[in-house]
Amino acid sequence: MEKNEPTQSKYDAALAKYNTQLDDAEIAAQAARIIAEKVPANNTPEVKKFLFNCIDLTTLNSTDSDESVMKFTQKVNKFDEEFPDLKNVAAICVYPNFAEVVKDTLEVEDVKIACVSAGFPSSQTFIEVKVAETAMALMEGADEIDIVISVGKFLAGDYEGMCEEIQELKATCKEHHMKVILETGALKTASNIKKASILSILSLIHI
């Protein structure tokens, strides 16, 4: 009797639809070429103003306190007075325990409140803790949530574990935006970065 062939997981099947075998040197050369060709045309005041308006102004220090975060937020409140020709930043990003401080201090309507969550930055904690932290950040006033993928799970080939965490956290966020950070420095290779990107995107549409 022949042994059954191992069944391919839906995650491996999804990755098989894309070319994920990338050469790091070739990718680096392509990136350098794009930078050389495109930077001069985009090194303009208009582009810089646009990019500034995309910034999440961030304070993630172990020394952060209610007072320091309040002062940090006040700088954003005063930005329009000091720089009337520039659009403000997109968001203020803080740890979840400071979401309420920002909410109570922020006076600018079009600046969002972003919170890192889910065991940021290592993502090494229980999924129950990740969900609870995310839910509490939203309850305290966060508009957006930033998470880091479970890099350890990804590198170990546990794509299911990584993707299910993303799905559960997005379900917690509901209509709120959730940013998935890949931690590319830990992924090392272009192939890993592409695989993690694909899996993260597909997780949000429930592969």
Regions found by a protein language model. Give the residues of each.
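Alpha-helix-loop-beta-strand connector modules within alpha/beta enzyme cores
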Residues: 96, 100-118, 159-179
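Structural preference for beta-strand elements that scaffold enzyme active sites
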Residues: 52, 91, 110-114, 144-148, ...
